[in-house]
Amino acid sequence: MEYEKEFLDYIKDYSIIVTFNGSCFDIPFLERYFETNINCAQIDLRFLLKELGYSGGLKKIEHDVGLSRGDDMEGVNGYTAVLLWNYYKDTKDKTAIDSLIHYNLLDTINLEHLLCLAYNKYADMYKTKTLEYRTLPIIESYKPNKKLIDYLHKNPYKYAPKSES
């Protein structure tokens, strides 16, 4: 809970938040969980990219525009992230949390690239200046554990989300 509060304190200094499906999931979840309002402009790339002809989830769109997450993160998605988190909670295996942080960092880095792509598509339509893409950084820390990820993909049952009954 401490880190989540730090996150809310951190984002309140920004006037715009860029997300993928955040207007439907992340922001409402945070507002309900913390009984607060996140009062800043939001750019939800899910809908912006849909208007430009890109559909599907974040990983599909990344693939469609040629963004690679690397071999170690092949097939890793939101469900895998939940498995990694549950595995970490159960085992305290640092490689699980490193893999999860690596996954989330890639989400964040690729959102910047997709925002630039969307902006440039609109800039071309309106014949205005486009943005230069920054070179995508290489993440040196938080290395993913490919063996653990493969294990969780093959044996998800123990670490799958529990249904609320």
Where would I find each of the regions flagged by the language model?
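DEDD superfamily 3′-5′ metal-dependent exonuclease/proofreading module
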Residues: 1-165
